[in-house]
Amino acid sequence: MAKAKGNREKIKLVSSANTGHFYTTEKNKRNMPEKMEIKKFDPVVRQHVMYKEAKIK
């Protein structure tokens, strides 16, 4: 029997410091319909900066 497709979608978290650095993660579209914003470490500028959700192409 085929496995049901889940609610989780792969997303890319892009640094707001415009360094080009990004993280990839998954989020549940049903529980979090809004765009994700989270503060994470950017190793290029060596600081914690805001990362914003973007689609994986």
Swiss-Prot record:
GO MF, one example: structural constituent of ribosome
Entry's Gene Ontology cellular component terms: cytosolic large ribosomal subunit
Protein origin, superkingdom: Bacteria
Coiled coil: none
Biological process according to GO: translation
Keyword Protein biosynthesis set for record: no
Ribonucleoprotein found in the keyword field: yes
UniProtKB keywords: Ribonucleoprotein, Ribosomal protein
Family note: Belongs to the bacterial ribosomal protein bL33 family.
HAMAP family for the chain: Ribosomal_bL33 (MF_00294)
Protein name: Large ribosomal subunit protein bL33
Source organism per UniProt: Shewanella halifaxensis (strain HAW-EB4)
